[in-house]
Amino acid sequence: MDFSIKACDWSKGSTNGFLTGKSDCIVIGVFESQTLSGAALEIDAATKGLLTRIIKAGDMDGKTGSTVFLHEVQGIGASRVLLVGLGKQDAFTQKVYGDAVRAAWRAILGTKVAQVTFTLVQAPVKERSSDWAVRAAILALRELTYKFTQMKSKPDTSTRALKRIVFSVDAADEKLAKVAVKQGVALANGMDLTKDLGNLPGNVCTPTYLGNTAKKLAKDWKLKVEVLGQKQIEALKMGSFLAVTQGSVEPPQFIVLQYQGGAAKAAPVVLVGKGITFDTGGISLKPGDSMDEMKYDMCGAGSVLGTLRAVAEMGLKLNVVGIIPTCENMPAGNATKPGDIVTSMKGLTIEVLNTDAEGRLILCDALTYAERFKPAAVIDIATLTGACIIALGHHNSGLFSKDDALAGELLDASKEASDPAWRLPLDDEYQDQLKSNFADIANIGGRPAGSVTAACFLSRFTEAYPWAHLDIAGTAWKSGAAKGATGRPVPLLAQFLIDRAAQ
């Protein structure tokens, strides 16, 4: 699909061919107040009051997400008009805008419309600009048109009728709207990569596959890449990481991707993604029900790859490093056992009380490795704990950080990106739950506050830099009839990096 911008100076009556230009459909928003403005006023005038008559007849009440198609409209170049309800104007929030936009796209996608002029981006969303609205509209459309069929014997190769979308914006917003198009497409491409990797089965998306994906990404976008194997990981003395992988026949990989968009000596932001390509729980075996979904335990790694792809496509002016420890967690005769004690790269000894708390074991060595980059900030992303799902459900990702400024940046980015996160506590008192009689630290702290103690464990390895942890166990994928990876938290991470690059 091709996205472009057309500027119209409504205040001066300059529509830049808006009414007469070739288009299969013009999308117009109507509030419950039924007051017409901007593009709607122009169309109403050109059609001799058609919109006014439709509204007065009660065919469009303006309620959020309601849609009405008008066919063979006289006086304009488009063959039809789609009216979309926007709800109450004084309550037109980010969420309501998203609901209205998705309703519009669903209506359009149910037709054979090939070219659309889209004016909903002009509607005044509270605390958001029209360029934000453009990007959100692109992401909504790409989300609705995403499909994963490559593992079927006959993949769906059909194409959508919709080919071209023109966003109509005020002349003053044209420059930023064009930037928003670039960002929206880049973000959607990054999310698609993240979703594709998550949706692949564990026998395809292995650690080696993730390593090869990183190499291809580096080649396509001129990134620097290193993919370390078993012997190199052993040489780095990553005993905690190796303890997780030793029960699997799949070799582990330690992936390091570097994007250089800023000054050569500028401190990078480091993203660390958990890459367990299949998690059985190891000797602490998981229940069989829904174990197939443990292919999604690499979604943290997938989000790092997707974010780096988006960052490279946007050409952001900062440096970013992606670190991905990736392996399987399998039971075997040589697998790590509950009660085993391993030594991390940092030198801390860890008593493995539960082999199904493996994500923190691979992340802690990656967080130690991150020190060599002298980072401006480190964010780890992991489908870490079921406890986070119990606490927050499937709407908010869990955010943990002792750095208030960094946490604030991430929360602001989550709101801007419509990719919500909620900050959870990281008080020192929780560390007591991780005490071990036999090692420096235990890898679990019991059932109470499970997501918090997991973050506390990771915090022991992050003292050298500002750090935040995102637990995406509840947000990285959906179950049931809509089963599939969501691409989150790529929007949050990308927005955080966009904001950092602008500083």
UniProtKB/Swiss-Prot annotation:
CDD domains assigned: Peptidase_M17 (cd00433)
Cellular component terms (Gene Ontology): cytoplasm
Gene Ontology BP term (one): proteolysis
Chief localisation class: cytoplasm
Enzyme category, top tier: hydrolase
Molecular-function GO term, any one: metalloaminopeptidase activity
Location in the cell: Cytoplasm
Annotated keywords: Aminopeptidase, Cytoplasm, Hydrolase, Manganese, Metal-binding, Protease
Binding site for Mn(2+) 1: 279, 356, 358
Pfam families: Peptidase_M17, Peptidase_M17_N
The protein's required cofactors: Mn(2+)
Active site: 286, 360
E.C. no: 3.4.11.1, 3.4.11.10
Domain of life: Bacteria
Cofactor note: Binds 2 manganese ions per subunit.
UniProt: Mn(2+) 2 binding residues: 274, 279, 297, 358
Chemical reaction(s) catalysed: Release of an N-terminal amino acid, Xaa-|-Yaa-, in which Xaa is preferably Leu, but may be other amino acids including Pro although not Arg or Lys, and Yaa may be Pro. Amino acid amides and methyl esters are also readily hydrolyzed, but rates on arylamides are exceedingly low; Release of an N-terminal amino acid, preferentially leucine, but not glutamic or aspartic acids
UniProt-listed PANTHER family: CYTOSOL AMINOPEPTIDASE, LEUCINE AMINOPEPTIDASE-RELATED
Biological role: Presumably involved in the processing and regular turnover of intracellular proteins. Catalyzes the removal of unsubstituted N-terminal amino acids from various peptides.
Family: Belongs to the peptidase M17 family.
HAMAP family registered for this protein in UniProt: Cytosol_peptidase_M17
Protein's UniProt name: Probable cytosol aminopeptidase
